[in-house]
Each structure stands twice: as C-alpha cells, then as structure tokens.
C-alpha cells in the first residue's frame, strides 16, 4: 500500500458502461524460457477466461529487441500447449485485433505517444541511467515489465518542466531545436500527491501515491520504441481486454497504467494479481533460474500437474 498524505484520490474501477463478454490475455515475453511463475499465472488467466465463458488472447510482448528470440517465442507456445492452455486469438491463430506481436504494432504506440504529447502529459528527458542511479543512490533504473521487479526508483525531476503542458523548448536544458530533433526519453508527468486506488480481484484494495510510491516514468525511449507501460495500455485497450491477470510484482505498474488510461481516455480493465513464486529465501524467481524453466522441468519428467501444484518444490 502507498504512503504519504494525498491531496486527491483517483479510484479506478473496471468500466461497466458497455456490456462486453470476458476477454483475458496472456502475454509472454520471448526473452527466455518460461518458468514456473509464468506457468501458474498464465494458467490462472486461462482458467478465469474459461470459467467466464470468454475469450483468451495470446499477445507476444517482444519489444526488447536485443533479448527477444524467435526460438523463445516458439518454445513459449509449445510449453503453454503442453500445460493444456489454449487461446482463441494470437499470433499463430489470428483474430480481429491482429497483429498480436508487439514489434508489429509500432504505429499504434506512436499515435498514443503523440496524443499524450499533444495533451501536455509528457516531457523530454536527457538523463542517462548513470545520472539517475547517482541521483537516486540506486544500482539501476528498471523499466518495469514482464520480467522485472516493479522497483523503478523515483525520478528526481531533473528535466521536469515547472508546469504541466509548459512549452518544452522553454524547459532547461532543452532548446526548441533539440526537442524537434528527438533523441530523448519521454516521461509521463504524474500528479504528485494523488492517491491511485483500485480493487484487485485477488489481493484486495490497493493504493499507491503518485510522487511518493512512484515518480515520472518513461513511456517512449530515445531509440524510438515505447516502454512496457505504454505498449501494455495501448494493446489492452485495442484488444478490448476486460481483465488483466499478472504477477503481484506489477502492482505498482497498474497504478501507472491507470494514469495512462485516464490520459488517453481508455476504460480500465479489472485486475487480478497472482502471488509470486519464490525460492526458500523468499526471492522472486525469474528467467535466470534455469532449474525452474519449464523446459528443464519437462526434461526431468515433471507433468503439468506437478508444475501447477502448490506443493512443487522451488529448488528441484
């Protein structure tokens, strides 16, 4: 839960103004083999879609061009089918909201970036990761995403204009020519002190305070690609997702995405954050833990029931 003394409260709830059948999604990132945590979260998403008589969408979140591999994408589809998970829309089966691979949806993300820019929510930032790490006394600045803990340090406001929507060329140290030339990271200016509240379907009421629990965050990178936060919001809206099922490490990302939805005029989906799979020391498992990749566990003779069971040992 968030801290601080908020001056405004944004209570976000799933939009119910239009009757729409359940639409869930699973979004593997092909930067490595799926592990036990992915399996359990994706199975929960599949089960909730099935129980609701709805549609499950598979979206390949492959925006990390340096680490994404087609072999990992193919392995993810195979592992998911082995678990008994099927989907009605996706890169392999098509559907009305294609393409279902993020690297092919760049035009949608750029349009959303332009909308946010025109509405005064963004500003350019020339700070390097080294600058931010030094300012925050943190080892790194992460872009919270499917494979990263949601621990982005607070942005110190180095490049933030004094007022939202202020002329960007008047915000030191940028000149008008530099802004027009691009080559910047673009940050979303959060409403400092506003409490973002939402009800999670699994973990209950949540509250995070903008400017306290999270700060201005990157939505567009200097390389010309969207961040996880922006791409996720754009795709969930375009694909008409009604409930997002994902790991509890992304709770804070939900608060950020609620702000993006409001800025873009999107309805909020419902949220269901699953408990994380941790090791015996309480550390979150990630793709670097090869011993718990589905590939390795399958080779050791484990069955889908073993992997989805709460009794599966975390060190095999």
What are these regions (language model features)?
Residues 8-144, 248-249, 255-266:
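N-terminal Rossmann-like or analogous alpha/beta NTP/dinucleotide-binding catalytic cores
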Residues 79, 112, 135, 162, ...:
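Residues that form generic nucleotide/phosphate-binding pockets
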Residues 130-285, 293-298:
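Active-site cores that bind ATP or allylic diphosphates and position pyrophosphate for catalysis
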Residues 88-91, 268-271, 305-307:
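Short, surface-exposed acidic
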Residues 1-33, 51-56, 83, 171-179, ...:
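Non-catalytic terminal extensions that flank enzyme cores
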Residues 24-27, 58, 95-98, 114, ...:
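Generic, low-specificity signal for short hydrophobic/alpha-helical stretches with a mild N-terminal bias
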């Amino acid at each position: 839960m968030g801290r601080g003394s908020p001056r405004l409260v944004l209570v976000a709830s799933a939009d119910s103004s239009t009757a729409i059948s359940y639409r869930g999604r699973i979004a593997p990132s092909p930067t490595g083999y799926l592990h036990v945590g992915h399996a359990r979260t994706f199975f929960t998403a599949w089960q909730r879609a099935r129980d609701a008589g709805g549609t499950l969408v598979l979206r390949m979140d492959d925006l990390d061009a340096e680490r994404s591999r087609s072999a990992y994408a193919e392995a993810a589809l195979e592992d998911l089918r082995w678990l008994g998970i099927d989907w009605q829309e996706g890169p392999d089966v098509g559907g009305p909201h294609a393409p279902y691979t993020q690297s092919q949806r760049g035009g949608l993300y750029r349009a959303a970036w332009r909308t946010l820019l025109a509405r005064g929510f963004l500003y350019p930032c020339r700070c390097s990761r080294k600058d931010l790490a030094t300012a925050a006394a943190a080892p790194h600045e992460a872009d919270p995403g499917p494979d990263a803990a949601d621990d982005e340090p607070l942005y110190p406001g180095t490049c933030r204009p004094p007022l939202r929507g202020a002329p960007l060329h008047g915000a030191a140290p940028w000149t008008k020519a530099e802004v027009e030339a691009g080559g910047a990271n673009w940050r979303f200016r959060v409403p400092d002190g506003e409490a973002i509240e939402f009800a999670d379907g699994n973990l209950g009421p949540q509250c995070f305070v903008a400017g306290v629990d999270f700060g201005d965050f990157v939505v567009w990178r200097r390389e010309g690609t969207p961040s996880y936060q922006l791409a996720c919001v754009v795709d969930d809206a375009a694909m008409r997702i009604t409930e997002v099922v994902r790991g509890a490490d992304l709770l804070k990302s939900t608060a950020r995405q609620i702000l993006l939805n409001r800025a873009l005029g999107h309805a909020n989906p419902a949220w269901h954050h699953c408990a994380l799979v941790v090791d015996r020391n309480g550390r979150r498992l990630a793709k670097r833990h090869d011993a718990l990749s589905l590939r390795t566990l399958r080779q050791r003779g484990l069955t889908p029931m073993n992997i989805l069971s709460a009794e599966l040992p975390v060190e095999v």
